[in-house]
Amino acid sequence: MKKPVVIGLAIAAIVAVIAGGTWWYQSRQDDGLTLYGNVDIRTVNISFRVGGRLASLNVDEGDTIKAGQVLGELDHAPYENALMQAKAGVSVAQAQYDLMLAGYRDEEIAQAAAAVRQAQAAYDYAQNFYNRQQGLWKSRTISANDLENARSSRDQAQATLKSAQDKLSQYRTGNREQDIAQAKASLEQAKAQLAQAQLDLQDTTLIAPANGTLLTRAVEPGSMLSAGSTVLTLSLTRPVWVRAYVDERNLSQTQPGRDILLYTDGRPDKPYHGKIGFVSPTAEFTPKTVETPDLRTDLVYRLRIIVTDADDALRQGMPVTVKFNYEARHE
């Protein structure tokens, strides 16, 4: 009777060992992978695209900011003056271009023809006078200087006649295509300067680029600012991302889209929910700021986890425990 008892006890022991091992394995599986990370710090330095004197700031540190909200303004006066000058430049260029397209009026052509006749008469007189002076110089009646003066007057009258003839020819044939093209280019340049002046004036108003919380107010009204200098620093509140790191052994468990549970010290019994949004393709050494029981020399891959039910209690930079378990996969 002892032998069957021993066999029974042995079988019972084996079953107990198997059951215990199964329970231990399943509990380990339910525990799943645990990682440690932080809520990403995401900030935007807000600045004017143009420089000038800061006229006003409408927000203070800690304020809740909405996208499109007016945050502050520069002194508009210099940019309003530049806009007026640009508008005048467009008007002048437009008038010149229209004049080039329209050509010359009949009255202008008639005036140019009269100028040619007058210049022709003056040239004829100067030429005849020069001819007479040549005869007198040959007979030694006048000096060489008198003859040179007559020749100079003749040449000047000839140049005046040539200029009047060219002007009349231009009036009759209209403006050259090159001149019209140049006038059109000048008009387009003036319009571009006007558009830039309008944009510069618009950029004297500082607009919030996104929703968030104001972290820093770096300057005060009255300050002279250069273009691009930081005026305000905005902390972006949505979406909330968690940055965590995983080693190569567990990399296969971190597929994008997988559901995750996120625990904080402030609410250990009420996890946040998230999804893996990005897995870095490049390995790096574990950053010193990350809490991890593993060796710092391990190569790890960065994860971005998108929190789907974030609230105001989840602050940027806050440490977070990331759980990959059965519950997270099925919630």
Swiss-Prot record:
Keywords for this protein: Coiled coil, Periplasm, Signal
Q: Which residues form the signal peptide?
A: 1-19
Q: Which GO terms describe its cellular component?
A: periplasmic space
Principal subcellular localisation of the protein: periplasm
Alphabetized SUPFAM superfamilies for the sequence: HlyD-like secretion proteins
Which ranges of the sequence are coiled-coil?
107-208
Compartment(s) where it occurs, according to its Swiss-Prot or TrEMBL record: Periplasm
Q: Which Gene3D superfamilies match?
A: 2.40.30.170, 2.40.50.100, Helix hairpin bin
Q: Which Pfam families match?
A: HlyD_D23 (PF16576)
InterPro entries registered for this protein in UniProt: CusB_D23, UPF0194_membrane_YbhG, UPF0194_transport
> By its UniProt entry, which NCBIfam families does this protein fall under?
PRK03598.1
- Family that this chain belongs to: Belongs to the UPF0194 family.
Q: What is this protein called?
A: UPF0194 membrane protein YbhG
Q: Which gene encodes it?
A: ybhG
